[in-house]
């Protein structure tokens, strides 16, 4: 009921982006975008109705990213919190975001202060191709960022791949080179975004196996 008033107030500020709650239709995003032009909108989908329209919501003008409102979604549907129970919903978020050329979807929050529980929940987000996770407190950010950032093995593989690629002449040799180049670039870009720099590793890392095609790629 306060949507219009909130947007009126926000239009007078230099807000860098908003998370729009209870998105259930394209109109929810487009009408918000009209009132806040050029402001990125994270569409928080929290109901069965919203999930059924998530492809259209992802493609709506103004949608910058999708986010999964797990708590309200479970209340709306009666689902439990087992990862297998929510697998279909999470998959829909990831596929819709990818199809609309959006950044990876943001998973919902984890309630509780246990670092182990939060780490395990973040691993589930990664398994379903999600590249962000809502935090309920500032204290959760470090654990979530650690879980979402590339592993040391992934970074070492990316560095080794490029070193070998250059030693072999730096030319595309077969159809597998392009996806591996893209994957290695993505790993190193993510490492930089999370403050992990190549200088933290040796110039000639030990040989490591290629990481599996998972959340980052």
Where are these regions (language model features)?
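Expand to "…catalyze enediolate/carbanion chemistry for C-C bond making/breaking, isomerization
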Residues: 1-217
């Amino acid at each position: 009921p306060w949507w219009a008033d909130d947007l009126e107030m926000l239009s007078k500020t230099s807000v860098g982006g908003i998370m729009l709650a209870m998105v259930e239709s394209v109109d929810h995003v487009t009408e918000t975008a009209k009132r806040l032009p050029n402001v990125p909108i994270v569409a928080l989908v929290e109901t069965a109705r919203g999930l059924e329209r998530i492809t259209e919501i992802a493609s709506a003008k103004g949608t910058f990213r999708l986010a999964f409102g797990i708590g309200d979604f479970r209340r709306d549907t009666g689902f439990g919190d087992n990862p297998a129970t929510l697998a279909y919903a999470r998959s829909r978020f990831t596929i819709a975001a990818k199809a609309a050329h959006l950044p990876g979807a943001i998973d919902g929050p984890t309630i509780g202060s246990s670092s182990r529980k939060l780490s395990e929940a973040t691993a589930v987000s990664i398994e379903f191709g999600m590249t962000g996770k809502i935090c309920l407190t500032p204290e959760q950010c470090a654990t979530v960022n650690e879980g979402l950032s590339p592993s040391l093995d992934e970074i070492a593989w990316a560095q080794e791949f490029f070193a070998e690629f250059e030693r072999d002449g730096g030319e595309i040799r077969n159809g597998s080179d392009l996806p591996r180049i893209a994957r290695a670039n993505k790993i190193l870009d993510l490492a930089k975004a999370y403050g992990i720099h190549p200088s933290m590793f040796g110039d000639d890392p030990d040989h490591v196996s290629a990481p599996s095609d998972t959340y980052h790629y």
